[in-house]
Amino acid sequence: LSSAASDVYKRQMYNFRTDLALERRNLYRTANNIKNEIDGIETEEEKVGDDILTTRVKVLSKQGEEAINKPIGNYITIDIKNLKVANEDEMQKASEVVTKELKALIDKHVSSKDPVLVVGLGNLYVTPDALGPKVINEIDITRHLLEYMPEVLNEDTRSVSAVSPGVLGTTGIETQEILKGIVQNINPKLIIIIDALSSRSIERISSSIQIADTGIVPGAGVGNTRKELTKDSLGVPVIAIGIPTVVEAATIAADSLTMFIQKVQEQAKSNDFLNQLQEEDKYEMIKEVLSPNAVSYTHLRAHETLSDL
């Protein structure tokens, strides 16, 4: 690619939708040719074994906030290789890493006995959006037991309640409005929200976890923005946990083009090979990359991944 075309391509890449702060940070650096860290952003990496990488992104100032379009706060991304084929021991290790990071964030905001409300966002009947409601069914709820049968629990048991508020299309009520009513009645000191996210990378589908203490704007990653669920709107700290389950179609196309260009450049001695092609030849080569067989294969892989949720 020419320098001008490359710059345009980088700017377009930055516009791709993603809920992950780490990806927004990486895209911004690429689009603006930044080799060091972005002003107002702090990043720290920690590797656990060969398969788990934890990246902590801190947005420290308004400048950092504007750069990656994420509020000031802490964003932790846990990338787990081979999660979809992990054995029991590997799953346990991944669980311990997630637990450690989540506990550290919770401890920053509340004490060990403060009541917590867990919220599972999403539509149970739409596979890529069903993460939140499905997780809610697996959580140990204690609020009612502490109220009516406290003798069956340890003294240090935290009060945990949970709700899956559905989606606006089926309830006619904004999630923020539902949660405001719940908060006013049961007075949790912290809200933990679980939701499906969008990613810039196919490789992160069902293989990465983001934990953030800035709350969440439901639907923002796929252009269907709803009212924000944050400390400002709900009155209590909000921690959001999400796993990417969708990627934008343009992402798949862009990745295919990138792989195609890289492959051609590897096989050619220089970029002269590309420059010598007529526009019609370039079009035919690109069309070959995006042939129905290639697209069908990509769709199949994504479908298999989502089915593992």
What are these model-predicted stretches?
Residues 10-69:
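N-terminal amphipathic/basic leader segments beginning at the initiator methionine
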Residues 155-182:
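A structural-propensity feature for long, helix-poor, extended segments
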Residues 77-81, 115-126, 162-166:
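Short glycine-rich or small-residue beta-strand-to-loop segments that form or flank ligand, phosphate
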Residues 64-108:
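An N-terminal, well-structured beta->alpha segment
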Residues 163-164, 193-301, 307:
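A structural signal for small-residue-enriched, beta-sheet-centric alpha/beta enzyme cores
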Residues 4-12, 298-305:
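Conserved small/polar residues in nucleotide/adenosyl-binding loops
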Residues 123-158:
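Glycine-rich phosphate/diphosphate-binding loop of Rossmann-like nucleotide-binding domains
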